[in-house]
Amino acid sequence: MKISVAVPLVLLFAFAAIVHSQTAQPPARPAWAWKPALPAANDGQVHVLPVRGRVSMLVGAGGNITVSSGSDGLLVVDTGTTAMSDKVLAAIKSISPRGVIRYVVNTDERDDFTGGNEKIALAGNTIRFRVATDPRVSDALAKDRASIISFVSVLERMSAPTGQKSKHPEDAWPDDTYSSAQKKLYFNDEPVLVMHVPSTTDGNSIVHFRLDDVVSVGDLVDMTSYPYIDLKAGGSINQVLDGLNRLLEITVPDTKTEFGTLVIPGRGRLLDQSDVAYYREMIGIIRDRIQDGIKRGQTLAQIKAEKPTLDYDPRFGHTTGGWTTDMFIEAAYRSLGGK
């Protein structure tokens, strides 16, 4: 009896599958038919997400913020927008109520990464290695504030040294800059590397917490949009690709588990190496399409008409807001030598 019942059920499911395959119309393009929900908070609150070991991620203050908490105090990578700085401070204190903010690292100078610099730095206090009256000490060591670290060009743009009035208060400026390939710290019992990785500007940094194996990358990876390439600040699509290749060199997958090196992007969800590889391939494909159009003598309008980003627009594209798909295509086109 069991066999006689099972056979009709199998036939029924097979028939249903045949009917479905005959009636369903598969989309010709794009490859992404869905837009995954990203855990970026839009509720006006700052949310704390534990990442690994000493490292946590703050979401909801503009760009993502990274916090290392331990015996030396707190190191904060990027500070969100000015409007959210009080809530960012409260979130940091929830991680370590007695922890002192010792360092702030800016991955670039964009307002949603540096807007909270002043308030967060003034709430901290850098560890002093020399007396405050020593003329060699930085501003942060002479004052009761956390030191702000960045690549030197970030300070140059934030301080407006060409004679223009800076829109950033002086206490928000980086006071501990570097101009070499990297700056090394030993903080909270682990090596921390601040590395110069030009991408969307000429002054981007990424921060590698080596023992916890977490990398905070700022604008190098944005899981909510195409890269914000700032041509005036020395950014280019080729630099973004070079930066992503550099990131892939220092990330390691764990074949036995789901993770390995974890990556905190400038916006969007927490990533692993496979996510970065996908993002790199996407940028490479789009770059090649635009470059091919330039080689064939196409204008910017003609390249836009061919929609070189179409496959990825459901996930990363925007038609409104401060950074649209058209703006990204134009920035990539100009950075590749298009006229």
Regions found by a protein language model. Name each.
Residues 1-6:
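Positively charged n-region of N-terminal signal peptides that target proteins for export
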Residues 46-99, 206-209, 213-219:
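Conserved beta-strand hairpin/beta-sheet module of binuclear metal-dependent hydrolase folds
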Residues 48, 71-75, 83-136, 146:
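Active-site metal-binding motif and surrounding structural segment of the metallo-beta-lactamase
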